[in-house]
Amino acid sequence: MSTDWQAWHAAYADPDSDLSRRRRSVQRQIAQWLDDRNDDRLRVVSACAGDGRDLLEVLAARPDRARVTATLLELDEGLARAAAEFAAAHDLVVDLRRGDAGTTDSYAGAVPADLVQMCGVFGNVTDDDLRATIAALPQLCTPGATVIWTRGRFATGDLTGEIRAWFGGEGFEEVTFDAPWARSTGSAPTGWSRPHVRWHRARRSSASSVSPACGRSRW
């Protein structure tokens, strides 16, 4: 049975829900990233963007939003429509694409990007596909780009260690880490899916090769 993603997003209406905590965590990191970058132009891509509020709400509140070129990829028609309506209501110019974020064609003209959001992707694919996605991420990134991703903590196992190692193997440096569930509950109850948020920065040459790097840790 396929997931009703619009019903899944209903949890965001509760400010104390795990999803709402995760969104606030992601939004803090997006805002900090924008503060840290003084570029005149920045390119952002959000895969499986849902209603796009994690990014769009941040942009709507910023006077420097015009320097951001944002592309949102979302397959669900209702969620894509909600993102478009929010963007229009707040005079945000974004490229909203109804398409499969798992195909390279969907990113045509939008990458390489300075910020790549993989929020909600890693908990909804197989482990093999997750590994392959991380391996492909350098192709979506400019030199020094940032990747923000989220992953739930599941009763069947926590892939945090493996995911961090996979990122490191592709030349990414972990910048910061946030676990909203830990702040709110102190621990993750067995059987519950609790969100982790990671922020990795890509360090690579202008060529296609990927090289590891050292840097600050913020997440």
Give residue spans per PLM region.
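Class I SAM-dependent methyltransferase SAM/SAH-binding core
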Residues: 43-45, 49-104
